[in-house]
Amino acid sequence: GQEKWRTQMGDINIGESMTMAPLVVKDRVLVGVSGGEFGVRGFVTANDVNTGKQVWRMYSTGPEEEVGFPGSVETWKGDEWKRGGGTTWGWYSYDPELDLFYYGTGNPGSWNPDQRPGDNKYSMTIFARNPDTGKAVWAYQKTPHDAWDYDGINENVLVDLNINGAMRKVLVNFDRNGFSYVLDRKTGELLQANPFVFVNWAKGVDLKTGRPIEDPEKRTSATKNTKDICPSAMGGKNQQPVSYSPRTGYFYVPTNNLCMDYEGVEVKYQQGQPYVGAIVVSKPGPGGNRGEFIAWDPTTGKKVWGIKEGLSAWGGALATAGDVVFYGTMEGWLKAVNAKTGDVLWKFKTPSGIIGNPMTYKGPDGKQYVAVLSGIGGWSGIGVAADMSLEDPTAGLGAIGAFKDLANFSNQGGVLTVFALP
């Protein structure tokens, strides 16, 4: 139980922090960096698992030798790439057969797109890297020149799927920009891109170029307040993870039905200070419900069934071999549903909103247990968890506009609730 080594991963004085779990691959400890709203330049670091010493570090933006992949610097104005965001605070996946690990990079800085013309590579990108060297084998940018804060760090799920009659080793990503992506995880070839929530900032994705087909009326700027952009910066899906069932072949996805008004503002970079540069108001999307829990068929790119929720589905999903799927709601309900039909089989009200992930395990007594941690907070719960005005819809980077009434449904307080199966 004694500490074996300790190493500093970043500099808090310039806004760098660490909010992710590391991934150990062979003798490497892979760790990213947070701080995209502070002008932090994203990077991923490999440390020696035995000594803690840095083996390599690769950045999201900048010269090829620092990114491990060509084509970044020329997509930025001047030296904006030095504070270009692309932080790496999400989830990492590893394929031992291909010996590649995968992760997403976040939004560029600042949120005002007028200050950083160009594609802003490699923010908003899925990287495939070699864990020994850090060199990137491929990179796919989902949202070039992000003008909506569609922070691209969501998890990448590695599965083998039948795509167009052939089995492919793929990576599946449900991005905050509202599109579900299926890529060949060996080559980075884009195989599918389909909206899994209501999307109007783009009309689709060109599979040949990989670029979104944008609606120019929904592009944001510091010269106007762009109205009713869907999804909002809070994402078609935020950081709550999906679950995949090889029994049904479906992904189970907790989603948001939120849109926003967005206006960029001029902001100057100051080391260690917020570097946002936008006024945002999130609000309920079409139909008024703010969330939906869906089953998604990745081979067809279509929703199979959905359960609409009054508030966003901000907790993760758990699919089991018994064809039962669990998920939580911001009101505090833990629900069990039929994986094939979406019928609600059972639900239990926990003391606070659920933004964590249900889990299951086998105890020493041989019984199977299901557990969930409730306790509202985070971005969606900031109106309850923090002291801020509920009369200002721009507060909490726009979260108050979407969840002003959250206190009517959920209180603070963290509780771990555990259920034993018969």
Question: What residues fall within each predicted segment?
Answer:
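C-terminal substrate/ligand-recognition segments
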Residues: 235-263, 273-348, 352-361
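Short loop/turn segments that connect beta-strands within beta-propeller blades
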Residues: 48-51, 113, 131-133, 185-187, ...
